[in-house]
């Protein structure tokens, strides 16, 4: 199941509840074509990988959170895990951390676009 996140408080609570589990957050918008394409795949992944926490942020209704997380492309997927930080990889070759002053979860991966194979491969790798 994909949990809808509306603000930073809900995101912090999600990380707290996730404990040591991998957290995958999708930043998307209703008007975004690639977001619509990947949405059912993301939902299916949430059912397939029950030991991973999945969340979705609508950037139009959660502008402050999207800005805080430096979202510039849609869809963007950010993966977080408790305090240990793994070497990050990004198609844009940059590391963006959504939680500069939040809970102890760290972003360990970010990807952009509706590439379901890459997303699933990275989830399997980081679980």
UniProtKB/Swiss-Prot annotation:
Which residue ranges does the record assign to the Thioredoxin domain? 2-127
Name listed for the protein in its UniProt record: Thioredoxin domain-containing protein 8
Specify the domain of life of the species encoding this protein: Eukaryota
Q: Which UniProt keywords apply?
A: Cytoplasm, Developmental protein, Differentiation, Disulfide bond, Golgi apparatus, Redox-active center, Spermatogenesis
Q: In which tissues is it expressed?
A: Testis-specific. Only expressed during spermiogenesis, prominently in the Golgi apparatus of pachytene spermatocytes and round and elongated spermatids, with a transient localization in the developing acrosome of round spermatids (at protein level).
Similarity section: Belongs to the thioredoxin family.
Primary residence: cytoplasm
What is its subcellular localisation? Cytoplasm; Golgi apparatus
For this record, the Gene Ontology CC terms, alphabetical, are: acrosomal vesicle; Golgi apparatus
What does it do? May be required for post-translational modifications of proteins required for acrosomal biogenesis. May act by reducing disulfide bonds within the sperm.
The protein's matches in InterPro entries, at most eight in alphabetical order, are given as: Thioredoxin-like_sf, Thioredoxin_CS, Thioredoxin_domain
Native organism: Mus musculus (Mouse)
Biological processes per GO annotation: cell differentiation; spermatogenesis
Disulphide-bonded residues:
32-35
